[in-house]
């Protein structure tokens, strides 16, 4: 029988299905997380107090978890290996184009809808993150992902890397507007935090969580479980292990599961030259967009 995982003081649990999928049936973010944080603001178990605990203590505690240690070691090794970042940054900057012009040229009404959604969603998400008080990194290009999901009406979307859930919220909202499609997400919680599973997807609205297929063991374990189940993938968003080897592994793993028309979005392509090398080797069109000093690569449109 699949075990239950109770995520700390926020109360409702996530039920593990199979070997790592999380069937998210109980909403615990947005209004409820804000209420919980307010009620516990002064208590010893508050999220603010959790955030102040030693990073090293949390690293050690999570390293003792058998399913965490191998992934942690791979991530630490990748960060210690200096990437060819300057070369990648120069290439991305040289090839960048305006995402506004791109979106408006394909479908002005849908691009306007995407911007309207993002303008409403961003302050709500920021409010949740401010209340939590835990650094969860930046999100993907959620405006672009909403737009692409609405534009292409994918049957199956795969994303690697969830964190707070900016991109997940964009895709799930757009799929709901489309009236069909499913999202399969692979993540590995921030191991510097205590009980890090509680924060994964924390900005995703409660109403969008039913049927969200979320796996939390890292890409190498998650993709082995997701790919036989999800069907052919029409939209793939890569935003997890940014190392050269990590990107190579993921693309090799999903290659035979992508539809011929699959749209591929890769975040942080300026971290190393993987995206440049990949698109030049495969041939065909590609696009590069700048966002907040970082760069996103797109293939398929």
Regions of interest found by a model, annotated:
Residues 1, 21, 27-30, 55, ...:
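Intrinsic disorder/low-complexity signature
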Residues 23, 27-115:
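Membrane-proximal basic amphipathic "stem/tether" segments
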Residues 43, 131, 135-301:
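S-adenosylmethionine/decaboxylated-SAM
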Residues 95-99, 105, 115, 121, ...:
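Alpha-helix boundary/capping residues
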Residues 20-23, 60, 106, 125, ...:
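Prokaryotic Sec-type signal peptides and long signal-anchor helices
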Residues 3-6, 12-14, 19:
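Intrinsically disordered, low-complexity segments enriched in serine/proline and basic residues
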Residues 105-139, 150-151:
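Class I SAM-dependent transferase core
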């Amino acid at each position: 029988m699949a075990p239950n995982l109770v995520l700390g003081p926020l109360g409702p649990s996530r039920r593990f299905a199979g070997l790592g999928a999380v069937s998210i049936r109980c909403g615990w973010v947005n209004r409820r997380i804000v209420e919980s944080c307010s009620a516990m603001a002064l208590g010893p178990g508050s999220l603010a107090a959790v955030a102040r605990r030693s990073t090293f203590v949390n690293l050690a505690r999570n390293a003792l978890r058998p399913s965490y240690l191998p992934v942690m070691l791979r991530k630490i090794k990748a960060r210690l290996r200096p990437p060819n970042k300057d070369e990648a940054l120069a290439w991305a900057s040289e090839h960048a184009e305006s995402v506004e012009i791109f979106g408006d040229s394909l479908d002005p009404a849908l691009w306007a809808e995407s911007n309207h959604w993002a303008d409403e969603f961003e302050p709500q998400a920021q409010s949740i993150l401010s209340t939590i008080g835990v650094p969860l990194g930046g999100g993907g290009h959620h405006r672009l992902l909403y737009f692409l999901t609405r534009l292409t009406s994918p049957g199956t979307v795969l994303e690697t890397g969830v964190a707070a859930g900016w991109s997940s919220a964009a895709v799930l909202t757009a799929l709901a507007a489309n009236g069909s499609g499913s999202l399969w997400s692979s993540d590995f919680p921030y191991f510097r935090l205590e009980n890090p599973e509680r924060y994964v997807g924390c900005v995703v609205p409660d109403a969008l969580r039913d049927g969200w297929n979320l796996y939390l063991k890292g890409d190498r374990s998650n993709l082995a479980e997701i790919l036989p189940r999800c069907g052919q993938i029409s939209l793939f968003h890569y935003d997890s292990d940014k190392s050269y080897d990590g990107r190579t592994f993921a693309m090799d793993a999903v290659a035979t599961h992508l539809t011929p028309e699959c749209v591929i979005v890769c975040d942080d392509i300026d971290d190393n030259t993987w995206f440049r090398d990949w698109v030049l080797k495969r041939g065909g069109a590609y696009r590069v967009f700048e966002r907040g000093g970082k760069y996103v690569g797109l293939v398929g449109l």
